[in-house]
């Protein structure tokens, strides 16, 4: 699906241009929204970037209910479209002094099918959004941050980033594994070129959102089997819980090539050990 620049809407609300600014892609809902909500609570200017106009309007309303000194800027953008991302960056910099933090969060899930059952269009869209969108956004914001002599870019990992495999996640997992390599390579380049830009990875683990049972954004539903639900009930968490942890880490960070992990091996092991008497059910 092609999203032309003529459908590119901008909603700019009053605030201060002296605050730090964070851009989060795919932030009208779910994990991304929790990021902009929490940064707004901390008086950041927040840039909500998403492909869904309706979701953007709803996010805008909720964010305006939060008392903050920062601005709210919302953009309907397809992150695979270079002109749209570039135009958004230009527009943001007319409203604020700097873009201090950029979080590549936008992504879509894979239909629960084997690789040979997927149409090429589905494969292309998965790779375009989950991998190439992250690369493109990083490419476009890096020169801005280099010119500022400061900035932070974080890429959100997913299943497959740690080389895990699962039936029905072949393309999604491949894309996320590549995102990990790309992030490490970008961190190396940023360091060797002495850019003063910090690069990092956000590893949230299993989040209980519509993402886990919906493919390609608002596409077909994914039916989770009982075994998968059991694992999600043990290891999963709501996005607001994970985002709270991540935002504090990001604000405090002063290092390049970092990885912020919510579901550590120790935490996962403890969850399994205590699952017999600590019952949770996200699917009731």
What would you call each of these model-derived segments?
Residues 116-135, 150, 154, 179:
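Catalytic Tyr-X3-Lys loop
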Residues 138-139, 184:
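A short, exposed helix-loop element centered on a Lys and neighboring polar residues
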Residues 154-178, 183-184, 188-192, 206:
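Catalytic loop of short-chain dehydrogenase/reductase
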Residues 201, 219-277:
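C-terminal helical subdomain
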